[in-house]
Every structure is written in C-alpha cells, then in structure tokens.
Regions:
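Glycine-rich beta-alpha junction loops
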Residues: 12-15, 21-24, 74, 101, ...
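Glycine/proline-enriched, intrinsically flexible loops and inter-domain linkers
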Residues: 126-463
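Short strand-connecting beta-turns/loops that link adjacent beta-strands
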Residues: 11-13, 22, 89-91, 294, ...
Length: 463
C-alpha cells in the first residue's frame, strides 16, 4: 500500500505488516562493530505507531489482534536508492556488492552473476551504470550528509517516482559561483552528483518550485520559452557542473591516442569530440578533448560520469609520464548559445568571433567584460554558440556582463531541461540515457568520431 508506506503478506499462518516509513531513523553513524551481522535492534514502537494506525484503519481486525513479534532491524540504504556494484575506483582489485536498499534477495542472483562476469572479464557483461559504484561521489562518505540523505531515501521506495523528482535532503553541497544570482533570477534547481543546477527558470510572480505530476508539469511552458529563445535569439546556460580533467605530460598524446577512438594528434587549440571504447567497441566515455599545448589536454565529460571517467583513465595508466588531475572546481562554464550568440559576445569583448577568426572546434583565450576566459566554439544544443571557461573567481562578473548586455540581443537564462530538449532535437547523445558501455559506437551512429587509420587504440578491432 504505497500511500501508507506499508506492505502486508501472509507469513507462517500469521499476518506480517512491514513498512518503509517516509522519514527513517539513521543507525550506525558512529560505526558498526566488525562482528555485527543482521540482528534485532531495540523496539521503537513510537516510530512505528503512525504506520500501525493507518494499518488499523485499513484492517480493523488488527485493533484486536495481538502482536506476536515486533521486529526492528537495520537495513542498508544508499543516497540514491540504488545499490553499489563493481570495482572500487580508488583500490584496484577491491570489489563491492553492497547497499541493497531492501532488494538484496531479489537482486542477488543477477547481481552475483554480473559481478562474477565483471571480475573474470574485466568489463561488465551489460549496462550496469545505474548500480555502478563509480557513480558515487567522494563527498558522499561524509557522515552528516549520509545521516540527512538516508532518512529520506528509505521512504522514497514507496513514494511516487515522478519524472524529474528531486531529493529534498542533503542539498546545496556543490554550487556554482553564480548560484545566488541564478536563484535571484528565478532558477529552480535540481541535483546531480551533489551539484545544484538550474533546471528551469520561473517567471516573475511564479512560485519557483516543482509541482510534480504524471502529466505536463508546471515548468513545461517555461521550458518551451527557453527552448525557443535558444533557437531564435540567444540563451545562457550555467554548465559549471561539467567534469574537467587535465591530462598532461610528455606521454599525454600517445596515452590519449590509445584510449580515444578519434585522432588526438591535432594542433593546440583544436577541440575533438570522441569516445573511449572497451574491447567490444562499447562506449565507456563520451567527451570532448581540447589540446591546450603540445603536452597538455583538457577533457570535458558529463558531471555524472566524472568519477567513472577518472577511474577509466587511471586504470589504463601504466609507466607513461602522464599526470591526471581533476580540475572541475577551478573553472566555471557559461554557455552562450543561439543565433545571436556572436553578436552578444562581440558586444562585451574586443576579440573577433567570426568564422574566419574563431572557427568551429577551436578554443581561444579572450577578454570578456573586465575578465578573461577561454572560449570553446562547440555546441550541445545544435545552434551557434560558445562555451566560456572562466576562472571561478571571475565567473560572477562575466555572468553580470553577459546579462547586462543581453537585453539588446534577446538573451534568456535557460536551464537543463532546455539543454536536454535541444540536444534531443539535434540527436546529440547523452551517456547513461542514449549510449552506454554495451552500445557499439557504430550502432550508436558515432562512426564519424572513430579514426581507425590513426593506429591502434582500445576497441579498434571491434570496429
């Protein structure tokens, strides 16, 4: 009975009543003894009483029936209600199958099979991204965070799983430097890997919050206007949550040539869209690579897959003279996208943004407002645009300069819902939704980003 967070079943001639209460009580926050196994905890009838009261209304016989056993036991819940499976990214050879969120028995056969295959072959036998341990973020081991979040995730098992439903607890951990400015403009935030991201913008006088529904939700018209602004004028997205990985050293080029399906041997300042493949030709990483110098490259990956992609890089690092660094927090990303993007940037920058001076697929250092940025001419929405990589300490200024000048160019602040609809309209892939490690790069329609003539690379034999 999801509305009452309860379940009923016959058990050895008796009625068993259990529950996934909406607000759970964290246990073991101070540590769990090494010899602990599943056991009974002290009775906590006050905590269970609201569930029992609703059960009596549903089954009045319970009011006179005696309670044979009141069992209170612990169960493991993760921050996102999915279990952890796979090799720990920090420790090679350390395999994990944990956090089963009360579905351990039903998952055991499949999870055991998948993990055994993964351990034996070195690759998961099929797409396991939803339960892959590499989705976990380093900050999620913080006990204060866990105490707050798991009090909610248990109850979500029996809650309505509305599209785009956001967690309510343990929020605000990772924020863009312009978080408060976006909030003042009506941003309604969603969470991804701890990042607070503007998903859509409420109009003046509109309550800036989700109203969940199985039908069109309250943000639909807002998102439509944002989408049209990107198509017809210019939109501004805060994509600071992009994962940013710096790969540098004298062996950086051959290291990336072995991992990437596209050709990394390009001039400094060039941007290359590529995938990293497994031995089956499946897609392990979907990214852009910008060559910064002869020995330095910047990899831009989805924020949700950053830990996965870092683990993939480090797993394949041998004796090469290469340093891999997560530089995500050092730069913000402001995406100026739409037919008027060039005119807007030209209004606040002395640099030349023409096709001749700044062609597609190149990155250049620019002046903007009173700040500096690195402008990448790429697009994830299918329109003319630039991604501006700005030092975190200058982001607020650059944002204000763009907004102030934007009124003359039809600028509209846009959220992630609009980014998603635009990239779907253009058929741009998104890892975890459209492509995974079990999707062959050619079957995914990404053969244009595969260069077999460049020489050997992981997955070449499969394509």
């Amino acid at each position: 009975v999801p509305d009452e967070f309860a379940y009923y079943k016959e058990d050895a001639g008796k009625m068993l009543l259990g529950a996934f209460e909406p607000v759970a009580k964290p246990w073991g926050m101070g540590g769990i003894s090494e010899d602990f196994c599943f056991d009974q905890l002290p009775e906590d009838f006050d905590h269970f009483e609201p569930i029992l009261e609703q059960a009596v209304n549903r089954l009045p016989l319970l009011a006179t029936a005696g309670i044979h056993t009141f069992f209170n036991g612990p169960e493991s819940f993760t921050p996102d209600d999915s279990y952890y499976l796979g090799e720990a990214p920090e420790i090679k050879g350390y395999w994990v199958a944990a956090g089963y969120n009360s579905i351990g028995i039903v998952s055991s056969g499949g999870a055991g099979f998948a993990l055994a295959q993964w351990m034996n072959d070195g690759e998961p036998p099929f797409d396991l991204w939803d339960v892959d341990i590499r989705r976990a973020q380093p900050f999620q081991k913080n006990r204060h965070y866990l105490q707050s979040r798991v009090s909610e995730t248990l109850g979500l098992l029996y809650a309505d799983h509305f599209p785009y439903r956001q967690k309510a607890t343990a929020r605000g951990i990772r924020r863009s430097p312009i978080h408060e400015q976006l909030k003042a403009h009506g941003a309604v935030f969603g969470e991804m890997a701890g990042w607070e991201r503007a998903n859509w913008f409420a109009d003046e006088g509109q309550t800036p919050e989700y109203q969940y529904s199985w039908k069109r939700q309250n943000w639909f018209d807002n998102q439509q206007r944002e989408h049209l602004a990107v198509r017809e004028a210019v939109g501004l997205f805060d994509m600071t949550s992009f994962g940013k990985i710096r790969v540098e050293g004298r062996d950086a080029l051959p290291f990336l040539q072995n991992l990437c399906a596209n050709d990394m041997d390009v001039e400094p300042g060039r941007i290359v869209y590529t995938q990293m493949l497994n031995s089956r030709g499946g897609i392990e990483c979907d990214l852009t690579v910008t060559r910064l110098s002869d020995t330095a490259f910047l990899l831009i990956v989805p924020g949700a897959t950053l830990q996965r992609d870092l683990a993939w890089l480090r797993r394949h690092l041998g004796d090469e003279f290469v340093v891999i660094t997560d530089v995500t927090a050092g730069e913000s990303v402001l995406c100026v996208m739409g037919p008027n993007a060039r005119n807007l940037l030209q209004a606040i920058s002395p640099n030349d943004f023409s096709n001749e001076a700044h062609p597609f697929g190149t990155a250049k250092e620019i002046e903007i407002g009173m700040g500096l940025a690195r402008a990448h001419r790429v697009t994830y929405v299918g329109e003319l645009g630039w991604e501006l990589y700005v030092s975190s300490d200058q982001t607020a200024h650059v944002f204000e300069a763009l907004v102030d000048a934007g009124a003359d160019h039809g600028l509209k602040l846009c959220g992630l819902h609009t980014l998603d609809s635009c990239r779907i309209e253009k058929a741009f892939r998104h890892f975890g939704h459209d492509i995974t490690d079990e999707d062959h790069v050619l079957e995914a329609g990404l053969g244009f980003a595969v260069k077999t003539k460049k020489g050997e690379f992981i997955g070449r034999d499969a394509v």
